[in-house]
């Protein structure tokens, strides 16, 4: 990361709100190189009234252990181990179409026929089709904001009468696009 910052005077960290490890690495590299660091905050989504919010994937998984119905996991491959104690036939993870994504599914013994390997974000219509095709009753997601297709997932859940479970964003400090652009103008 420090090599990428060579010659830069400012670094804008616009990583996913849940990419805490990447943010830490970027911040440390900026400190090491003396590059000015700014964290861009994505606007949080307005959560639908009937959504269920948990702090962690483990809490969501524990809740889902006592429910019935198929579960679409759109939280990413790194969160899959939290759901390993749920009847695996109920789990339908939507992961990136990479070896790492597939291996993460295999590590918790998800049947290949249940793996949805696609790269998003996804339209409202595609989300609806997936919910209907796999008879999903629960969708677990992170609030990735508009960039992450959160509202399309939420609207598809509403349309298909699927319960929406949201993993709360990590608390962080940051800035708006406007304030970061203003700082960039000052540096010109």
Which residue ranges define each predicted feature?
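Short acidic active-site motifs
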Residues: 1, 59-60, 79-82, 100-101, ...
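Glycine/small-residue-rich loop that forms an oxyanion/phosphate-binding "nest" at active or ligand-binding sites
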Residues: 2-60
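Structural motif
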Residues: 9-10, 70, 137-138
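Short secondary-structure boundary segments
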Residues: 15, 95, 142-144, 168-170
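Short acidic-hydrophobic, aromatic-tinged amphipathic segments that line or gate anion-handling sites
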Residues: 51-58, 175-183
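Anionic-ligand binding region
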Residues: 69-115
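Short, flexible loop segments at boundaries between secondary-structure elements
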Residues: 100-101, 163-174
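A C-terminal functional module that forms or caps the active site or interfaces directly
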Residues: 106-129, 133-138, 143-160
């Amino acid at each position: 990361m420090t090599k990428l910052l060579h010659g830069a005077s400012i670094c804008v960290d616009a990583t996913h709100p849940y990419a805490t490890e990447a943010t830490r690495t970027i911040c440390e590299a900026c400190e090491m190189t003396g590059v000015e660091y700014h964290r861009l905050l994505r606007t949080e989504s307005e959560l639908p009234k009937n959504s269920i919010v948990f702090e962690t994937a483990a809490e969501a998984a524990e809740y889902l252990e006592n429910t019935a119905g198929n579960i679409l996991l759109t939280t990413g491959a790194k969160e899959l181990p939290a759901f390993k104690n749920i009847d695996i036939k109920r789990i339908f993870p939507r992961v990136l179409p990479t070896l790492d994504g597939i291996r993460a599914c295999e590590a918790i013994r998800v049947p290949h026929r249940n793996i949805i390997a696609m790269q998003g974000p996804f339209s409202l219509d595609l989300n609806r089709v997936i919910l209907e095709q796999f008879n999903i009753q629960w969708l677990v997601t992170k609030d990735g904001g508009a960039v992450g297709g959160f509202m399309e997932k939420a609207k598809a859940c509403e349309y298909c009468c699927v319960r929406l479970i949201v993993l709360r964003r990590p608390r962080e400090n940051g800035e708006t696009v406007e304030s970061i652009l203003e700082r960039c103008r000052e540096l010109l």
